[in-house]
Amino acid sequence: MFTPTICRFDYGQLKVTIETGMMARQATAAVMVIIEGTAVLVTVVAQKEAKPGQTFFPLSVHYQERSYAVGRIPSNFFRRETRPNEGETLTSRLIDRPIRPLFPKDFLNEVQVIATVVSVNPKVNPDIVAMIGASAVLSLSGIPFHEPIGAARVGFINGAYVLNPTPEELKQSDLNLVVAGTKNAVLMVESEANILTEEQMLGAIIFGHEQQQIVIESINDLVKKAGKLKWPFTPKIVDEKLRSCITEEDKKDLSNAYLITDKQERYAKLNEIKTNIIERILKENETVNAEQIQDILYNFEKNLVRQRILKDEPRIDGRDKDMIRALHACTGILPRTHGSALFTRGETQALVTTTLGTSRDLQTIDDLMGERSDSFLFHYNFPPYSVGETGMLGSPKRREIGHARLAKRALMAVMPNIEEFPYTVRVVSEITESNGSSSMASVCGASLALMDAGVPIKSAVAGIAMGLVKEEDKFVVLSDILGDEDHLGDMDFKVAGTSEGITALQMDMKIQGITPEIMQSALHHAKAARLHILSVMNQVISSASSTISQYAPHIYNIKINPEKIKDVIGKGGAVIRALSDETDTKIDISDDGNITIAALSQKSAAFAQQRIEEITANIEVGRIYQGTVTRIADYGAFVSIASAKEGLVHISQIAEGRVEKVTDHLKLKQQVSVKVLEIDRQGRIRLSIKDAIADTSEHKIEDTPVDSSFEESQKQ
C-alpha cells in the first residue's frame, strides 16, 4: 500500500532520516524528517493557478508544536493547542526567510508550508529539523523552486565552532547562530553573540554553510528518486509596446521625484506622477489594465534607484553610500516611567521605556524544550501612524514579534544576571516614525533607556542596518538604509553590538545568495557605523544611573531558616498576604529561605523585615510576650504572640482564683501579656496570663506595656 522513499545521512554527530510517500499523500508533497528522535512532518500545498488580480507572492509558512511530541497534555483550559506561541512564530519566520527568494519572481500561486513537530528529543531542537524538511518538501513537490537549501546551527565554545550544539551546550556557548543557504551562497543568518569580533562571526557563517552541504546533496539525491515533475512555468514577458508608452518626460518626472529627500513629500509627488501616467495610458489603450502599468513603473523606479547607487551617485536622501543619517538622542523624557529614551535617526524614531518589576513579573515559558523563566522582556510596537497610514490595531504581528526578538538578542550579552540585579526588566519600543531600520533604532533606544533606569548593563549597544545593490559582479554596500532602499535593494543586513564586538546579526536576502566577500564588506562598514552611533549615544549617557527611579520598586533580600517558611506564609497564605498589606510591600519566598521584599520606600522595607524577624523568632519558654486574643472558647482563650504564633491560655491560667466564664475577663482583640509555660512536641504553646502578671514586677516585658486596666482588674 505504501512505497516510501527514504534517505539517510550523517550530519556531523547526528543521524538524519528523510522519508516521503508514507504520510499526507494528498498534499502536493510531504516529508517526515527525523534527527535523533526529533521528528517533524512537513507538507506543502500549492494552487495550480494564481488568483485573478494577484500582485504579490502568497507564501505562508506555519510551524506548529504538538504537546504529545514530549508526552504531555496541554495545561490550558481546553487541553489542546491553541494560537501559536512566540517560539512557533519565530520559527515560522526562520523557515520562511531563506526559501522565499528561491521562488521565481513572477510566480504568484498560493503556497502553504506546514511543519508539525510530532516527536522531540530534548537534545535536538526541532527548528533546524523543520528547516531541512521545508527545503526537502519544496524540492520534491515540482513547484517552481530554484534549488534546495541547507540549515545549520553554529555554536562557539572554548574558541571552537560547534555544529548543531545541544541546548545544554548552547548554555556554555558564546554564539547561537542559524545559517541557511544554497550550494553556492548564503541566504539567511540569525544570531545572538557574546560580543564576538567581525572575523569570528564571518567564520561562523562560513563554517555553517560548509557543513550544511551534506544536507543539500542528500536532498538532491532524494529528488532524483522521488521528485515530482516540475510544473510548467513561463516568466511574465514584458510588454515592450506598453513600456514605450512611458515617455521620456514621464521618466524625467519620476527621476526628479527621487531627488526629494523628505519621505512624505516624495511619496506624494510620486503618487501624483504615477496616477497621471496611468490615467493617460488607460485612455490611450483600453486593452491594458492599471496593474500592468504599475508593474512597468515599479521596474523603472527600481532600476533608477539601483543604477544611481551603482554609479556612486547620491542616494535617495542625498547621502553617499557610507553616510549615517542625522542622529538625536535624549533620556528621561517621561516623568513617571522607570527609564525612558527617545532615539531618532533621520526619519526613523523610537520611544523606548524600561520598567522594573519583581520576581512575580517573571515570564514563564513552557514549550517542548521545557519550562523556564525569563527576567528580561522586550516588546516592539509598530503603529500605522509611524508611516503616515491608518490601520487595524490588535495583538502583535509576526514582524513585531521578530523585531522584538532581534532587539532582545542584541542586548542579552550586556544584561546583568538576576543575582547582580534582582529585577524583572521589561523594555518596550514604540516606533513613532519609520523610514528604515526601526529594529536597530529600538536597540539604540533600549540601551539608553536601560541606563536611564539604572540597569547596570555592561556596555552601550547600538545597531545599524546595511543594504546591498548587486548587478552581476558589481555590488555596493549601503550604510543605514532607508525603507525604499530596503524595498528596492537586494539585502537587509542588520548588525548590533558594543564598541568591542557583535551581539546580534540578522541577514535576509532577496536575491539568490551572498558571497563571503560581500559579507566581509558589510561587516566592515557596519562596524564603522556602529562606533559612530555609540559615540553620539555616549554623549547623552555613557553608564547606568547610580540610583533607580523613585517610582520603581526597591528590592531587599533577607535569609531565614527554611523550616520557618511555613510560619511566614501561614495557612493558605494568610500571614504573608496580611504582612504585604500591613507593610505595603511585595514579599516573595523561595524554597531555600531567601526572601525578597519589594517596596517603594526603605522605611516600608525595613518594617517588613522587622515583622518577618518577629515571625521567625524562636519562642522561649519562661519569656513574657505581648499578645492579642484571637479566639475565645469555654475552656480558655487563644492568644497570638510574636506576630503569627498562637498559644492557649487555659481558663485556669487567666487569673488567680476560680474563673467561671472566660468572657468575664477577656474579649476578642484585647491586648494582654502572657508567659510561655511550655511548648510540646507538636509545637503547641501553653500560655499563662496570671503568671505574667505575677512576674511583671520582676521581669521586663519585651514588647509594649501591658494593658494597665486589664492588669488592675486581675488584681481586684
From Swiss-Prot:
Catalytic activity as recorded in UniProt: RNA(n+1) + phosphate = RNA(n) + a ribonucleoside 5'-diphosphate
TM region(s), chain numbering: none
UniProt xrefs under Pfam families: KH_1, PNPase, RNase_PH, RNase_PH_C, S1
Principal EC category: transferase
CDD domains found in the cross-reference section: KH-I_PNPase (cd02393), RNase_PH_PNPase_1 (cd11363), RNase_PH_PNPase_2 (cd11364), S1_PNPase (cd04472)
Keywords: Cytoplasm, Magnesium, Metal-binding, Nucleotidyltransferase, RNA-binding, Transferase
Stored InterPro entries: ExoRNase_PH_dom1 (IPR001247), ExoRNase_PH_dom2 (IPR015847), ExoRNase_PH_dom2_sf (IPR036345), KH_dom (IPR004087), KH_dom_type_1 (IPR004088), KH_dom_type_1_sf (IPR036612), NA-bd_OB-fold (IPR012340), PNPase (IPR012162)
EC number: 2.7.7.8
Domain S1 motif per the UniProt entry, residue ranges: 622-690
PROSITE patterns: KH_TYPE_1, S1
Residue ranges annotated for the KH domain, each copy included: 553-612
Subcellular location per the Swiss-Prot or TrEMBL entry: Cytoplasm
Molecular function as annotated in GO: 3'-5'-RNA exonuclease activity; magnesium ion binding; polyribonucleotide nucleotidyltransferase activity; RNA binding
Keyword Nucleotidyltransferase assigned: yes
Residues the entry annotates as binding Mg(2+): 486, 492
Alphabetical GO biological process terms: mRNA catabolic process; RNA processing
Cofactor: Mg(2+)
Assembly mode: Component of the RNA degradosome, which is a multiprotein complex involved in RNA processing and mRNA degradation.
Similarity comment: Belongs to the polyribonucleotide nucleotidyltransferase family.
Role: Involved in mRNA degradation. Catalyzes the phosphorolysis of single-stranded polyribonucleotides processively in the 3'- to 5'-direction.
Protein name: Polyribonucleotide nucleotidyltransferase
The gene coding this protein: pnp
